[in-house]
């Protein structure tokens, strides 16, 4: 591990059309030392070729090539291969601002009690951009829904301590489950006031694919099975389909002796 080094993990599956722009936004960071690890997850477009070209052009860029295994395994492969003290996942079509890492690591490097630093964000597409309105962080709010996008800053040692991203989480929102296991036993979270992350909206965005009722039910069942202790502590019982009603509903059931 190289002290002070930030490793940007860029899993990429058929995102060649956006990959160069994503890497350019990472290279434009005002923070150094920096490495960018592109994990090609079995792409069938020109992503691997583009990644290798970027690798030859920029000493900060390295490429891993693997058979298609999904984003969680791609991120974990990146974590295992990185040299950085700090990590920042960045999907192959999203962007970051030049000062995001610099401001975030100013906090992580000096405040050991802080586990995660993120920022304000915007969603964008060809038709324009708009603020991504996120609720303030608290553990109880995290139990109901995620407010930390995956492109946050954290320490490699903390990610390794919880086993990285759960590779059996194939239902979307794998970042939510990662933050739960990273933070449920302690650690502070800081949100920077700057807009530092830009989430690209595309017709194939994963959030659109995994937003249906069946996915939601399966996802909630998975989370309850894996983090029952967390939901009991924060919501007085399991997470419900109507997530914001989980705590009052559980409290009512316990009052009547039905939970």
Model-based region annotation:
Residues 99-131:
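Conserved donor NDP-sugar-binding/catalytic core segment of glycosyltransferases
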Residues 4-7, 35, 175-177:
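Cell-envelope/extracellular polymer assembly enzymes that use nucleotide-activated donors
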Residues 66-82:
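Glycine-rich, basic loop-to-helix element that forms the pyrophosphate-binding segment
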Residues 24-33:
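Short, acidic, metal-binding catalytic loop of nucleotide-sugar glycosyltransferases
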Residues 40-50, 69, 91:
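A conserved acidic beta->alpha catalytic loop
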Residues 87:
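Short aromatic/hydrophobic "clamp" motif used to bind/position activated sugar donors
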Residues 20, 45-53, 95, 99:
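Acidic helix N-cap motif at the loop->helix transition within catalytic regions
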Residues 138-216:
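Conserved nucleotide-sugar donor-binding catalytic segment
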């Amino acid at each position: 591990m190289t002290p002070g080094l930030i490793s940007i993990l860029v899993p990429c599956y058929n995102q060649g059309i956006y990959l160069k722009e994503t890497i350019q936004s990472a290279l434009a960071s005002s923070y150094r030392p920096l490495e960018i690890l592109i994990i090609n997850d079995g792409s069938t477009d020109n992503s691997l070729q583009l990644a290798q070209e970027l690798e030859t052009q920029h000493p900060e860029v390295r490429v891993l090539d693997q058979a298609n295994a999904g984003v969680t395994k791609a991120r974990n492969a990146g974590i295992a291969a990185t040299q950085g003290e700090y990590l920042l996942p960045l999907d192959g079509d999203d962007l970051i601002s030049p000062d995001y890492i610099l401001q975030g690591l100013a906090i992580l490097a000096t405040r050991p009690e802080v586990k995660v630093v993120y920022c304000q964000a915007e969603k964008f597409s060809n038709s324009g951009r708009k603020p991504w309105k996120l609720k303030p962080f608290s553990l109880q709010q995290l139990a109901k829904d995620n407010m930390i996008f995956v492109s946050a800053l954290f320490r490699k040692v903390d990610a390794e301590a919880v086993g990285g991203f759960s590779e059996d989480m194939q239902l979307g929102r794998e970042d939510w489950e990662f933050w739960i296991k990273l933070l449920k036993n302690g650690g502070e979270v800081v949100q920077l006031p700057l807009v530092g992350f830009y989430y690209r909206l595309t017709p194939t965005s994963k959030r659109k694919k995994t937003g249906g009722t069946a996915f939601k039910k399966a996802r909630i069942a998975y989370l309850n099975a894996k983090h029952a202790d967390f939901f009991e502590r924060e919501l007085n019982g399991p997470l419900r389909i109507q997530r914001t009603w989980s705590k009052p509903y559980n409290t009512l059931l316990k009052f009547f002796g039905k939970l």
